[in-house]
Amino acid sequence: MSALTIFTESEATTPVWYSMDAAEMAEKLGSKGVRFERWQADRDLGDNPDPETVIGAYQHAIDRLVAEKGYQSWDVISMRADNPQKEALRSKFLSEHTHGEDEVRFFVEGAGLFCLHLDGHIFQVLCEKNDLISVPAGTPHWFDMGSSPHFTAIRIFDNQEGWIAKFTGDPIADGYPRLP
């Protein structure tokens, strides 16, 4: 189940706030400019769907965001435990970084952990199937897919280039809880 855990920047072992209630999560994240919503990922995609199948199944959701925010491109990221690149990708995503655009993800299956570095706190957002998260441009963050990843998410972009990270060099991500 989706969850939001908040830590202070100086204390990575004891949370100061926790909730699994989507409305509470949306309110707390919204106060920081982060969009969090529960959408319906109700299409049967099979065991290992190709990107075209995922896009086709959720084109209506993509169209809604494009109409609302003017996004220009989208793709699908899908990761499974048997992917030979999983360790390299996990390592890359675990380094704190920012983007020059919003980072928008709609989870259509599985789960992943977004960790947002905001105002002296770390907001850990466990996103699961049905979750839409939009992290504002310039927000320092990292993403953990776990050591045995299983997720499929639609990524939506402001530009045609797709995912472009600017790494901060801050090792803060190393001290916070990760997915198993």
UniProtKB/Swiss-Prot annotation:
Site (described: Important to generate the dianion): R105
InterPro entries listed in its UniProt record: ARD, ARD_bac, RmlC-like_jellyroll, RmlC_Cupin_sf
Note on how the cofactor is bound: Binds 1 Fe(2+) cation per monomer. Binds 1 nickel ion per monomer.
Reactions that this protein is recorded to catalyse: 1,2-dihydroxy-5-(methylsulfanyl)pent-1-en-3-one + O2 = 3-(methylsulfanyl)propanoate + CO + formate + 2 H(+); 1,2-dihydroxy-5-(methylsulfanyl)pent-1-en-3-one + O2 = 4-methylsulfanyl-2-oxobutanoate + formate + 2 H(+)
Positions that bind Fe(2+): H97, H99, E103, H141
EC number(s) recorded for this UniProt protein: 1.13.11.54, 1.13.11.53
Binding residues for Ni(2+): H97, H99, E103, H141
Required co-factors: Fe(2+); Ni(2+)
Keywords for the protein's UniProt record, in alphabetical order: Amino-acid biosynthesis, Dioxygenase, Iron, Metal-binding, Methionine biosynthesis, Nickel, Oxidoreductase
The keyword ATP-binding belongs to this UniProt entry's keyword annotation: no
GO molecular function: acireductone dioxygenase (Ni2+-requiring) activity; acireductone dioxygenase [iron(II)-requiring] activity; iron ion binding; nickel cation binding
Pathway, per record: Amino-acid biosynthesis; L-methionine biosynthesis via salvage pathway; L-methionine from S-methyl-5-thio-alpha-D-ribose 1-phosphate: step 5/6
GO biological process, one term: L-methionine salvage from S-adenosylmethionine
Site (May play a role in metal incorporation in vivo) location in chain: E96
Taxonomy, superkingdom: Bacteria
Site (May play a role in transmitting local conformational changes): D102
Function noted in UniProt: Catalyzes 2 different reactions between oxygen and the acireductone 1,2-dihydroxy-3-keto-5-methylthiopentene (DHK-MTPene) depending upon the metal bound in the active site. Fe-containing acireductone dioxygenase (Fe-ARD) produces formate and 2-keto-4-methylthiobutyrate (KMTB), the alpha-ketoacid precursor of methionine in the methionine recycle pathway. Ni-containing acireductone dioxygenase (Ni-ARD) produces methylthiopropionate, carbon monoxide and formate, and does not lie on the methionine recycle pathway.
Family to which this protein belongs: Belongs to the acireductone dioxygenase (ARD) family.
Oligomer and partners: Monomer.
Protein name, as recorded: Acireductone dioxygenase
Protein source organism: Erwinia tasmaniensis (strain DSM 17950 / CFBP 7177 / CIP 109463 / NCPPB 4357 / Et1/99)
Encoding gene (name): mtnD
